[in-house]
Amino acid sequence: MASNGYLNSIDAVPPPLIDSDGRPPSPPPPPPDSFVPPPPPSSLAPPPPPSSDLPPPPPSELQPPPPEPKKKKGWGAPKPGPLSIEDILKKKKEADEAAAKPKFLSKAAREKLALEKRAKEVEEQRRKRESEQDNRIPVGTVNGNGYGAANGRDGYERSHQQDNARRDSSFVPTGPRAMRNGQQNRPSSDKPNDMEPPPKSAKPATTAAGSSKASVAGEKRPANAEDLQAALIRTRYMGAETNQSTFSAKKKRRRTTEKKFNFEWNAEEDTSPDYNPIYQNRAEAGLYGRGRLAGFAEDEAATLKYAKALEERDIEAGSARAREIVEMERRRKEDAGRNSLDKHWSEKKLEHMRERDWRIFKEDFNISTKGGAIPNPMRSWSESKLPKRLLDVINQVGYDEPSAVQRAAIPIALQARDLIGVAVTGSGKTAAFLLPLLVYISELPPLNEFTKNDGPYAIILAPTRELAQQIEVEAKKFATPLGFTCVSIVGGHSLEEQSYNLRNGAEIIIATPGRLVDCIERRVLVLGQCCYIIMDEADRMIDLGFEESVNKILDALPVSNEKPDTDDAEDAQAMSRHLGGKDRYRQTMMYTATMPPAVEKIAKKYLRRPAIVTIGNIGEAVETVEQRVEFVAGEDKRKKRLNEILASGEFQPPIIVFVNIKRNCDAVARDIKHMGFTSVTLHGSKTQEQREAALASVRSGATNVLVATDLAGRGIDVPDVSLVVNFNMATNIESYTHRIGRTGRAGKSGVAITFLGNEDADTMYDLKQMLMKSSISRVPEELRKHEAAQQKSQRGQGLKKIEEGGFGGKGGAGGC
């Protein structure tokens, strides 16, 4: 029948094979057709046989295979031969291919597999629970020790039964007794392979390694009544455990194996206090008196109310007391506004400035002062103590805001104090000493027919002719509107011409040291009433060998009005008094960029208790100048590179090119003309008329490029210089600083390009340090790694000490 055929197809499953060692062989790999669903489990009942009315199924290729012949068992069964490597590889390949193919399972099949898996898990848990119950020995029946069962027979039988049960089941061996956490007391006759596994943890471990570590560390399962009773008995007979470590391996494992950081937070992590009405509602403490806290009223209404109550209570003295209360409240409000820290110094009035505000003000302008009784700097021209007519002249000239050195030096100079100003080049030093000078001589009697022959009231010394003439031009802007006369005495002009200019007398004389000494020795000029001396670029004068000339000039001054070297020299009122109704104490000012020992010696000899004003850092370049250094070897390559820079159109004229040798000036200027640019030269071999004409052509814009030596490196002010090119690197870092200071003046920006070669090794270290200090400059890699830039050169140190000591000099390049 069809039904019998269907049943035979189900029951025709071959019996499991048995290996020679009695174990069933490994199951065969899955069929290649992975889309065929797995056979139903044996636990499910087979479907009912089809009715006899239906025709038998047609024969097809899917008919079940015929039953295999039964194999012989026992000693007569043929022994299976060893598998060949080809068969093993073939089976493995087929298994891998079958596992790699996707298997389609319907929803019903997936549910059936899940039910089977769940049923197996439940059966496994039930079997383990029964095994644990069978293996557990009740407390008090420990066998073989005389305090359990009546004799050791019970323990032996139980152990024998457990051994038989374990051989029949898949038993997992356990570790030694010390690792079982005292769960039960086993008989001493148990073998190592009879120990049961440790109980499962209530909380499953994340990994197998973590589970094993937790078991070894002694993770305890949930305690029950039997475990507690066993623990009490163990404590009673064996004593309490001592020196028990509180180290938690679980916590350590969680801390060290935590690799994923959780960026979220839970509500349990919130440690802020909950809502508390005590902290939400602030208590207002009403105190005695007219106000609340500390007895002060919070508003004006309460103060007025209190004052009115005083008047009503005491008719005679109450009104006076009420007025005092109101006035005290007004002063308190003013003090609160004056002492407020939220306002910048620029928003406060002068009388509201505190010491903290002045400290911030000095830091903003990089001002540092040294000396006693130094006044605060001025914030603007209107807050200075300059006379009204001089302020009008300043406004006409176009000085909107004072520079840093003017803010600090002018208030000190107006107190008749001796002053040493250390400032970078291009910082406005000329106006810083000219304005106090004009205020000083305006208080002296004007020159007449008799007093004009006694000499000037003030002299200004400059190291070079160009700087002296530049100071003269600047001084005439302020002195001429006030009615004062300024005359310059420099070399290059005839002595008769300068004597003619002095025929009507002059309040201010600007001169170079060499020519001024000639005039004094030839009796062209006397200093009988000179009481104001200014030395500009004092360090440069010493370098040029004018120390002896400076000493002669200062020794020729009258000594009747010399300041005392006492504390009175710091008293502004005492130093402002007139001596004998006409003369005043002599006032000496010195401005320099560096302070070599020779300059310090002059200052100590001729200045009395001077105030020292420093702007910026000594010897550093202006922060507005971008310094670029290029390694270019050879004259031809440098000329080619100079042509590229000038032809780029990046820099607008005027442009200054510095060289070290006079004969190179004319050669470089000639090459620049061949490039298509106009150029003039400036060096010591030029006559005074040629120097003045060259500077005038550059300042007027008629000439594009000025080629000069270090003669034009200091004090020469050519407005709007956009580029300075050091065709040859300066011989020392001080000259380099003054060279690049020709650009970036008056707060404007500029660029300085320096051509460097191996012959400049003596200055590489200082140049690298200067570039590193600049925030807008970059040190080239070749200079950073150069051997000469790693340490300061020691060459020429002895000669430098002799020059600084005043025993020699470099000659009078800019002298008379």
Curated annotation (Swiss-Prot):
InterPro entries (alphabetical): DEAD/DEAH_box_helicase_dom, Helicase_ATP-bd, Helicase_C-like, P-loop_NTPase, RNA-helicase_DEAD-box_CS, RNA_helicase_DEAD_Q_motif
Region Disordered, residue ranges: 1-106, 118-227, 781-816
Signal peptide range in chain numbering: none
Positions of the Helicase ATP-binding domain: 410-613
Motif range (DEAD box): 536-539
Record field: catalytic activity: ATP + H2O = ADP + phosphate + H(+)
Basic and acidic residues composition-biased segments: 87-100, 118-135, 154-169
UniProt keyword Hydrolase, yes or no: yes
GO molecular function: ATP binding; ATP hydrolysis activity; mRNA binding; RNA helicase activity
Ranges where the Helicase C-terminal domain occurs: 624-787
GO biological process terms, semicolon-separated: mRNA splicing, via spliceosome
Subcellular location: Cytoplasm; Nucleus
UniProt short sequence motif Q motif, positions renumbered to this chain: 379-407
Keywords: ATP-binding, Cytoplasm, Helicase, Hydrolase, mRNA processing, mRNA splicing, Nucleotide-binding, Nucleus
Residues that hold ATP according to the record: A423, V424, T425, G426, S427, G428, K429, T430
Ranges of biased composition (kind: Low complexity): 202-217
Gly residues bias locations: 805-816
Entry EC no(s): 3.6.4.13
Residue ranges with Pro residues bias: 24-67
Chain segments annotated as transmembrane: none
Known partners and oligomeric status: Component of the U5 snRNP complex.
Free-text domain note: The Q motif is unique to and characteristic of the DEAD box family of RNA helicases and controls ATP binding and hydrolysis.
Descriptive protein name: Pre-mRNA-splicing ATP-dependent RNA helicase prp28
